[in-house]
A protein has these predicted regions:
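A detector of short terminal or domain-flanking linear segments
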Residues: 1-16, 84-105, 111-141
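Short, positively charged interaction helices/loops
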Residues: 57-90
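Short amphipathic alpha-helix starts
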Residues: 17-34
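Short, basic amphipathic alpha-helical segments that act as recognition/interaction helices
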Residues: 3, 7-13, 30-34, 42-66
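N-terminal start-of-chain detector that recognizes signal peptides
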Residues: 14, 19-21, 72-77, 98-100
Length: 141
């Protein structure tokens, strides 16, 4: 069976962003609140998103080089049952590498996923049914 690196099959729009929780000291939080009350930012979330985007911009070239070196698909990548059936008919297995969101559609059975997905590396989020995630657990890096 031939192993192939995945290329974009289909694009999706995320229904919701991933949420994160951070712990901040009271002084840091107070300084953020001060900037919000002084109208530098509309709210705490605006400040945090801006800070994250600024840091990502600072390290943008490093990220770009790492994406190319690791052969990652950048953005949103969805795998439907039809996509994976085509992979099975071709006798291939996917080595999924995504920076962003990898989504295995609800119509993908555990058997089809196991037969067609060799490994999954996701820097970001993986959306799949609980059963598919459990079946692929040893292949998720």
């Amino acid at each position: 069976m031939e192993t192939k690196t995945v290329t974009p099959l289909a694009r999706i729009k995320p229904s919701d962003a991933e949420k994160i929780t951070i712990n901040l000291g009271y002084v840091d939080l107070g300084q953020i609140d001060l900037l919000v009350t002084e109208s530098f930012y509309s709210n705490r979330t605006d400040f945090i998103r801006t800070a994250i985007r600024n840091q990502l911009a600072v390290h943008g070239e490093v990220v770009k080089q790492a994406v190319a070196r690791k052969m990652l698909v950048l953005g949103l990548q969805q795998f439907t049952a039809a996509d994976l059936e085509a992979v099975r008919r071709a006798g291939d297995r996917l080595e999924i590498r995504v920076l962003g969101l990898a989504a295995i559609a609800a119509d993908v059975s555990v058997e089809l996923a196991l037969e067609t997905i060799g490994s999954i590396t996701v820097l970001g989020a993986l959306h799949a049914s609980t059963a598919v995630k459990a079946a692929l657990a040893s292949r998720i890096r």
